[in-house]
Each structure stands twice: as C-alpha cells, then as structure tokens.
Regions:
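Basic, helix-initiating cap at the start of DNA-binding domains
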Residues: 1-23, 27-36, 53
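Amphipathic, non-transmembrane alpha-helical scaffold segments
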Residues: 5, 55, 59, 63, ...
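Short coil/turn segments at alpha/beta junctions that flank glycine-rich nucleotide-binding fingerprints
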Residues: 22-26, 77, 139
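Short hydrophobic/aromatic patch on the recognition helix
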Residues: 38-48
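Hydrophobic alpha-helical connector segments
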Residues: 57, 61, 68-97, 151-155
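Short secondary-structure transition hinges
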Residues: 90-128
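Hydrophobic/aromatic-rich alpha-helical bundle segments in the mid-to-C-terminal region
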Residues: 137-183, 193-195
C-alpha cells in the first residue's frame, strides 16, 4: 500500500473511531466519517466497504493496543500485585472512553455481524489472558491450585467494582480505592501479614 493510501486509511479510521466512540455505530454515517476525515465517499469506498468495516478495524486496533499495554505492564520488573493494579486501572481507562451507545451496540446484536466479530475479539483476549495466568502460575506469582478462569472472572468483577462511584467516594483518592481492591484480592478480609 502506498504511503498516501496508508495516510488516507488512517484518517478514515481516526475519524470513524472518534465518531463511533462518541455516538455509537448506528448513529453515524459514512458521509459524517468522510467529512471528518476530509475524504470523498469514493475514496472511502476504496478503503472500506461500509461503516461497519471501519468499526471492526477500529475495534481490532483498540483490542491490539490494549493487549500490547497489558503485555508491557506484565513485563515490568515490579511486584505482581502492582501489575494487577495497573491492569485494573488500564481496564477502567479503556471502558471510560466508550459511550453508553457503543457499549450497548457491542453487547447486543443490533448491528449485523458485529456481535460475532466482538465475540471473536473477546475470545482471543480471554485465551491470551488465561495463557498469561498459567505463565504466572509457572513462575510462582499465582497459586498453582487456582483455576485461571476463576481469576479472570474475579478480575472482571473487581474492575466492575472499581467503577462504583458511591464506593469510590468513601476513599480520599482513586489510587487509594484501587489499593483497597488489590489488597482485598491478595489478602482478603482477615488480618495478617502483608507482603
């Protein structure tokens, strides 16, 4: 692909992504994407079949970037519980960028073919995350007798807990709140020695 074509494709993706994250997929048009990207519809059609194709490319890129950040966090030379805290914070930042409209569209099957695509992305991330947990079991960072699928479920629930604004208001800062969540994950509610 020529440099100009790559640049044009990137402009379309950036414009489509900005509109999609703000308004959802259903409420935007190819015309709006073209105007924001500064391209004609003919140029758009040279790169993408329709707005759903743009949405899929934006989502794929978003998931790839998220996973690269997860790998970067997990490769840091810091204690494992700090890695998990950064992971939860990253997940929160990721979901804050999504409008309610896009979240609803991706969870429901309101756009033909999108639910299947999103399920494929989700399964890919789940498989990678479980493989990562197994690696940390082998290195001794996670108990070997706990199922990785259980850990994944608990992390998802803790991420949801971290979105609770009423609960967050009980703490002086978001960092203190996340620390409490992490300490609960690692040490439970019983008093005792902490690492």
């Amino acid at each position: 692909m020529k440099a100009k074509d790559v640049e044009t494709r990137e402009r379309i993706l950036a414009a489509g992504g900005a509109l999609m994250w703000k308004h959802g997929i259903s409420r935007i048009t190819v015309g709006e994407i073209c105007r924001k990207a500064g391209v004609s519809k003919m140029t758009f059609n040279k790169h993408f079949e329709n707005k759903v194709a743009v949405a899929k490319a934006v989502l794929q890129r978003s998931v790839d970037e998220l996973w690269n950040k997860v790998v970067e966090i997990m490769d840091r030379p810091i204690p494992f519980h700090d890695k998990v805290g950064l992971y939860i914070q990253l997940r929160l930042e990721q979901t804050e960028a999504w409008s309610q409209e896009i979240a609803r569209e991706l969870l429901e099957d309101s756009i033909p073919g999108m639910a299947e695509f999103v399920n494929g992305l989700r399964q890919s991330i789940l498989d990678k995350t479980i493989a990562m947990f197994r690696h940390f079991q082998e290195t001794g960072d996670i108990r070997r007798d706990i199922k990785p699928e259980f850990l994944l479920s608990m992390l998802n629930r803790l991420t949801e807990t971290a979105k609770d604004r009423d609960l967050m208001a009980l703490y002086p800062s978001f960092q203190t709140f996340v620390k409490e969540i992490m300490e609960f994950l690692f040490y439970g509610m019983l008093p005792g020695a902490r690492a």
